[in-house]
Amino acid sequence: MSTVSGLKRPQSSEKNHRDRVFVRATRGKVQKVVREQYLRNDIPCQSRACPLCRSKLPKDSRGNVLEPILSEKPMFLEKFGHHYLIPDSNIFYHCIDALEHPNNFFDVIILQTVFSEISSKSIPLYNRMKRLCQEKTKRFTPFSNEFFVDTFVERLDDESANDRNDRAIRNAASWFASHLASLGIKIVLLTDDRENARLAAEQGIQVSTLKDYVQYLPDSEILLDMVSAIADAIASKEQVESGTKNVYELHWSMSRLLACIKNGEVHKGLINISTYNYLEGSVVVPGYNKPVLVSGRENLNRAVQGDIVCIQILPQDQWKTEAEEIADDDEDVVVSTAAEPDSARINDLELITKRNAHPTAKVVGILKRNWRPYVGHVDNATIAQSKGGSQQTVLLTPMDRRVPKIRFRTRQAPRLVGRRIVVAIDLWDASSRYPEGHFVRDLGEMETKEAETEALLLEYDVQHRPFPKAVLDCLPEEGHNWKVPADKTHPLWKNRKDFRDKLICSIDPPGCQDIDDALHACVLPNGNYEVGVHIADVTHFVKPNTSMDSEAASRGTTVYLVDKRIDMLPMLLGTDLCSLRPYVERFAFSCIWEMDENANIIKVHFTKSVIASKEAFSYADAQARIDDQKMQDPLTQGMRVLLKLSKILKQKRMDEGALNLASPEVRIQTDNETSDPMDVEIKQLLETNSLVEEFMLLANISVAQKIYDAFPQTAVLRRHAAPPLTNFDSLQDILRVCKGMHLKCDTSKSLAKSLDECVDPKEPYFNTLLRILTTRCMLSAEYFCSGTFAPPDFRHYGLASPIYTHFTSPIRRYADVLAHRQLAAAIDYETINPSLSDKSRLIEICNGINYRHRMAQMAGRASIEYYVGQALKGGVAEEDAYVIKVFKNGFVVFIARFGLEGIVYTKSLSSVLEPNVEYVEDEYKLNIEIRDQPKPQTVQIQMFQQVRVRVTTVRDEHSGKQKVQITLVY
């Protein structure tokens, strides 16, 4: 497509309106496309020192003039004077970690050109830039140079898009410098592009590389660690080009990869690295019954967990099974930046090809990197103690065992020993055994609660910054004094039902403050029951297309850790105005059923409402009240009706094939004052837990059907696909060999039935253990937009429901907020917002909240694991455990008491002579001969076996951190 540029000259202005004319030729036809671009002259510079732009400042929704962002007297540096910064796109792309430093880089102008370039390369980086603009103390401001008459530039005929953008950045910097010159404020253009810097200097623009600039800042030593990797990367590339020996095969070119994907020579997919063996990954490929195995350092070829890779299937005689050994820590440490000789490398695990081998492949290219900031600690063995404060190369050992060690350069090496730090990967050349990165920040001393919690939040990408002012400005002005209007003629009462006289209560975990749901039940004159589920009316406060709505969508969910909660919504809403607390009036969204004695639904209707909860119970308190026959008040009788009906509803679900799976859930008892862990206990589930669950499920199903009927293409639903039968192959074989049992997995109903039948009278816990392992064969449930799947694929496999959504927790889940908006439109309470009719936008939102949901779950589990370790610190516990995986050099056990999994290495069974180990693969068994006893003995370990283990925490001398150690008691 060729481009013709023209200038349209309206009578009012010659400069403010441009046409861009594109001439497109398709199949011999010429089509002219005209795109108009209007240029403005009223965009302010955002400097508080500038009197000329005062009249151009925008106003907020209340008509108040918004104050300029940039300070009146910006930072003074001897070389640059008082100045504002304009970084180019590459500075943000490569060095945003440095720009985010809390004590440096203030008064920064982000040009629209830069925003556009970054958004096309990396949406996560683009979002980080937007968040910087929301941080009041940093004073980062966007500037629409592409729409400003004095800074817009046309692309020249012989000019590349990149060169045009560089020129636009220089032009904007030149305008700012001229505009602010009389105020004594200078502009510094930050760029590491030599040609861009040369051209800027020729235009008289003050220019600096980032590395030169940070040398003048107070925290220069830390900042230099954060930016030096870019210069090192350039040097590394020059070294590769000069003939440095490669450790890995070169990746194929992008054009070759795309062509080979098209012709089927290679396959693309997301790579998952094994949690037991960092040298083994797998990729799900359409057409293969099992995930394709990628085994060994060379075959992984620099792929990192979560990368989108291209793989080439190896010849069948090179196919392998999954690793039979647990890969221990990488013991050989090499920090040289040159390619290492073969003798310095760790030998990859040797795997034997067997009759049931997996399709095996090698990585030939990477389509999309999943690099992120990684939390870990400096490997002490890589620190040269004699170097003092000079820069040296060290290795980061990431917390995530699936991630390789990361090489980075730092001047702070001795000070970083024993610290939790964050490092980002910059590149991984074929000549380097390890990826290269740069230091981002120090989180604090390892094993301190603050540092480990911060590390956990970063590792699982939990957004935990304070809510920005733009979000807080969306809250009601009355704050905690907000009340439901007393006058029912008030507009806020319009189309709301008054349910304040209903005997409504909530039942939640102890100490719950963000109460999403409440219930009631009563007998109707015709003998049927009225049952109501009342959900916090969050969407009354959180409106579409507001800063609060964007923030909630970005966070996706509230994250629950042992000692804290990371809220999706500001606390004023989550724990007060939206929370269905007792004894106060609250707005709600109610789902009301009429049911008969057998819990058959006669009719259902939905309405916005006003409720006044009569009581807030914990599960235990509600159970005690129901069980106390002295309590015959109407509220308690209503709770008994709810319990009776919930049991019928549950049985109906089970009869339809709903799965009763198991997952380990523990509760950490903490000190009330310090939040230090004191003990670990298994969560006790009561009938009231099931009571609440059944009615929440019923409400979600009822709402799902309603919004799908109203919006068949854009309803936000939740599906749980049936797992492929091959997911059960390994578990089926283990069951057959070790127990002589079999699971029927063709439907959820047959699976539920066979799970009930798999009972070992000698081992009461076996059935629970089997349900835990069956859960791991399942696919994850996911949010989706109804127009993207056929109705049969809406089904929720685990719940045995043909349709499902999430409606009942809008305080803590953004998916529920969307369902509330769609339901409100479906009952004609309000018109549908255009954003909820945009299928492509909803698909994007669903993908985002699916990701946030997964991360929140993993963060919660990691928090429990950390606190279990802290509760055990300094002590020794002997507990029953169950073998759930067997390798050549160890076995994995599950300790039900702590909900903890851990590895028992066979070498730990002897203190002097290493045991002789016979691995009986076909029987999932280890015969371990322990030789340093007065009389040698043989210990036998097999899948599902109950064993006694000793659990302690020990300080790892190599890493300097505490870790749980599990040994066999025999």
UniProtKB/Swiss-Prot annotation:
Residues covered by the RNB domain: 496-827
Highest taxon listed in the record's lineage: Eukaryota
Protein EC: 3.1.13.-, 3.1.26.-
Keyword list, A-Z: Cytoplasm, Endonuclease, Exonuclease, Exosome, Hydrolase, Nuclease, Nucleus, RNA-binding, rRNA processing
Subcellular location: Cytoplasm; Nucleus
CDD domains given in the database record: PIN_Rrp44-like
Physiological role: Catalytic component of the RNA exosome complex which has 3'->5' exoribonuclease activity and participates in a multitude of cellular RNA processing and degradation events. In the nucleus, the RNA exosome complex is involved in proper maturation of stable RNA species such as rRNA, snRNA and snoRNA, in the elimination of RNA processing by-products and non-coding 'pervasive' transcripts, such as antisense RNA species and cryptic unstable transcripts (CUTs), and of mRNAs with processing defects, thereby limiting or excluding their export to the cytoplasm.
Protein name as catalogued: Exosome complex exonuclease dis3
Organism from which the protein derives: Schizosaccharomyces pombe (strain 972 / ATCC 24843) (Fission yeast)
